[in-house]
């Protein structure tokens, strides 16, 4: 299906077709890396790790079994129009989060650059990822934390 040019600038996330919605994903794979929350209230922090879902191809940032991911990885989260308010856990580079927050897509996003390789060329992919099955202690793999997480 042909996408309308610059559809993300003329439509809200709620107005997008399924094809447009899927096209927003830049393929960085960051949403497939494990995160955890520690603390409560004002002391609550969101920790990002370099621990990847076992289905994630660490080189490309793509799911190894996209069509069956929810059957294989039961904790895989489907981003939908219904869970838009929960997007605060997504990386600050994520198109879904950016558009939900009223921001623009970055120049390296494939919809802007026209290249599926622009994410890798812009150094957006997580380096030295490791699959969850190979990890014992998650604390060794923290790469960032979000103090403003709510």
Curated annotation (Swiss-Prot):
Domain of life: Bacteria
InterPro entries: Puta_zinc/iron-chelating_dom, UCP006173
PANTHER family the UniProt entry points to: UPF0260 PROTEIN YCGN (PTHR37421:SF1)
Family according to the record: Belongs to the UPF0260 family.
Protein name from the UniProt record: UPF0260 protein CGSHiEE_04300
Pfam families registered for this protein in UniProt: CxxCxxCC
HAMAP family per the UniProt record, alphabetical: UPF0260
């Amino acid at each position: 299906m042909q996408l309308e040019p610059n559809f993300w600038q003329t439509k809200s996330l709620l107005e997008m077709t399924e094809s447009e919605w899927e096209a927003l994903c830049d393929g960085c794979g960051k949403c497939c890396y494990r995160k955890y929350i520690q603390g409560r209230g004002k002391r609550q922090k969101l920790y990002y790790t370099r621990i990847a879902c076992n289905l994630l191809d660490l080189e490309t940032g793509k799911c190894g079994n996209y069509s069956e991911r929810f059957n294989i990885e039961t904790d895989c989260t489907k981003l939908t129009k219904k869970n838009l308010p929960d997007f605060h856990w997504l990386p600050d580079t994520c198109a879904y989060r950016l558009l939900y927050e009223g921001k623009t897509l970055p120049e390296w996003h494939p919809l802007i650059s026209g290249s599926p390789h622009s994410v890798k060329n812009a150094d957006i992919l997580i380096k030295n990822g490791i699959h969850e099955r190979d990890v014992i202690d998650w604390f060794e793999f923290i790469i960032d934390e979000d103090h403003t997480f709510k």
